[in-house]
Amino acid sequence: MEKLDLHGVRHHEVDLMVENFIFLNQEEIPLTIICGGSSKMVELVKKVLDRTDSEYLEGKGLDFGRITVIRI
């Protein structure tokens, strides 16, 4: 399973990084994107995934900040 860790990534870099990651690794589904505890980072990632019509699962509770992409 491929993983993208966004710790230390600036908000303005997220869009391009996430889009490149999901399209370059679409054969490796499921994909994991680690956003950390930032609600803003989670929203930025979800915006990209929604725009690309990707299906994903959001982590809840202790898994908050982890998004698993299940279809692109």
Briefly describe each language-model feature range.
Residues 1-72:
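Long, charged, low-complexity intrinsically disordered regions
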